[in-house]
Every structure is written in structure tokens, then in C-alpha cells.
Amino acid sequence: MKMCRMLLANAKLTNVDAKNIDWLITSGILPPLRYDRILLDPSAKPGWYPRLNPSAQVPFLLYRTEKLSDSDVIMKYVDLFKGEEASLLSKCGEEGFKMAMDLASSIATPRYKLCFTKDATKEDADALKNALSNLDQTIKGPYFMGETLSLADLAVFPFLNAWEFVMGRLLQMDDASGDNVDAIASQWPRVLEYRQLMSKEPCVEQNAFQEEEFIKFVDDIVNKKAAAAL
């Protein structure tokens, strides 16, 4: 059984930028993997961490002599544990995976601004709406690249978590978007279908988090930022 140690920035940040690694490890497609998760506060990393990982980046994977940073690099590395023919990357190819990572990045920045800051603007809301529209047009269906689950799905889907909360933030920034969450979300019908499908994947169900949990985490982060600014 392979052993690996994964260092992640924060328990809840795994839901945002490293949940894809958790889902990959528990996908059932790979052989059983044991791994230790060490959760770090990105604003107060312990002194030993830079000695282990000079870049001090998260997420970070330590496996035997391998030290890897960046979620895309870690995902591709872990994906090969069962062999190239069985890899999820082979289902989408490098091009499809890069496309998914680029879309995920385009969602991540405005999503973060809307959720975790008090200075989000209508421009941030528009950027997220444009990113979701691009995703809606790109999904081949039923999965991101077609008929089978691929590494591309695990790259993009974590950024569609806490959906109703994020849609609510959009409404706050742009009241012309619709009267309620359902109205604004209806702009992206393929994304909605995709979310329903992916939410039923065993690896997602096993690692899913409740919307209330995410909201509490957002409140904690916003309150800490406000306190630090005093």
C-alpha cells in the first residue's frame, strides 16, 4: 500500500483548491491509498514547514523522496499510481485537463473575492458569471469531456461547491441577475446538470461538505480579517 503525506493550507481550503486531490485519492479508480493530511494556516505557517518545503506553497505532497507543489502537478502524479492505461488523465488528455484547470482558475479568483472579501464589486460578479458561461459552453456532457469521468472533472468541480451561497453573493452584487438563486443559476443549465451528476460520484459524496459548514468558514475568515485590520 502506498503511503503519502499531504500538506494542505487549511481544512476548508481543501474544499476550494485541493479538494480535487482528496477526490482523486478516494475515487475508487486508484488502488487504496493511505495518506496523512496536515492542515496549515496559510497566514501562520509553522517554522518547520519551509524547511520541509522551501517554496512554502500549499498544497504540498511528500511521498518517499518526491516533494510536489501545485494541485495540478500533484493530481497528475497521484493519477499514475495505478498505471498509465487506467489513469483519469488518459480520459481527457493533457489538453482537456489544461482546459479544465484554466476554467477553474477563471472561476476561482472572482469566487474568492465574492465569498471572502468585503470589497467585491459588480465587476467581480460579472467575471464569475462570464467564467460560468464559458464552463457551460465547454461541458461536453454528461461529464466535462464526454461520457466518462476524467481528471478534468476533478480539476473543475471543487469550484462549484457551496453553489447556493455563491449564487446568493452574485445576487447581492448584481440585482439585475434575477429575483432569486434559482433564477440566476438558470443561466447555466449545463452546469446545473453537471453539478447534479458529479454530486452523486462516490468520491465526491465521501468528501463533500455541507453548505452551512462553508458559510461558517467564510464568516470566520471575514471576521479574522476585520479584527486584524483594527
What are these regions (language model features)?
Residues 84-87, 168-172, 204:
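Charged, solvent-exposed alpha-helical segments that act as regulatory interaction surfaces
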Residues 197-205, 219:
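Long, amphipathic alpha-helical surface segments
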Residues 51, 200, 209:
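Phosphate-coordinating loops and pocket residues in cytosolic domains that bind phosphorylated ligands
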Residues 39-40, 205-215:
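Acidic carboxylate-rich catalytic motifs and surrounding loops in phosphoryl-/glycosyl-chemistry enzymes
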Residues 100-200:
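GST-like fold's C-terminal all-alpha helical module
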Residues 1-145, 225, 230:
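GST-like domain detector, emphasizing the conserved glutathione-binding G-site
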Residues 213-230:
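C-terminal helix/juxtamembrane-tail motif
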